[in-house]
Amino acid sequence: MKVTQHLWFEKDMEAAIGFYASLIPGSSVHWVTPIMADTPSGPAGSVRSASFTLGDQRYMAIEAGPLDPFNHSFSIVVECETQGDLDRLWNALREGGSVEQCGWLKDRWGLSWQIAPTRLGELMSDPDPDKVRRVTAAMLKMVKLDIAPLEAAAAG
């Protein structure tokens, strides 16, 4: 048994998944193909589907016109080892999109992402509740997450 997330794009699916795959090491687009039968979304050939991998996570996608737009109930979380990787990914994904609090952003296609340092999970799960409160307070003041201030908050 395999579990795979599936994304519904109104348009520009191939551009979106190609862009995502170019940003994350170990990613690739496996295939993009038209659905050669009439569907509720359009005539044969007008709807396309795809398979792609981001890092070690496989996804499927469809480009089938408007349905429900992406929203915060689904996001892709990327944990970055370094601030440089976090900054690079954040800056690329936010181009043409919008940024939000605590490392969240929406890309130009409306898909929500959480770009976070790997270290954040370690800091947030520390057994010292005072440390966790300080880290949380620091994080809540940030839009793009920054490892150094989070580490400083943890240190007190």
Regions found by a protein language model. Name each.
Residues 8, 77-79:
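Short hydrophobic/aromatic beta-strand micro-patches
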Residues 7-56:
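Core segments of cupin and vicinal oxygen chelate
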Residues 14-16, 61, 70:
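Intrinsically disordered, low-complexity acidic/polar segments
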Residues 40-41, 72, 155-156:
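A charge-rich, low-complexity, intrinsically flexible signal that marks solvent-exposed coils, linkers
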Residues 2-4, 71-75:
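Short, solvent-exposed beta-strand edge segments and adjacent coil->beta transition regions
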Residues 30, 51-53, 60-64, 68, ...:
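Vicinal oxygen chelate
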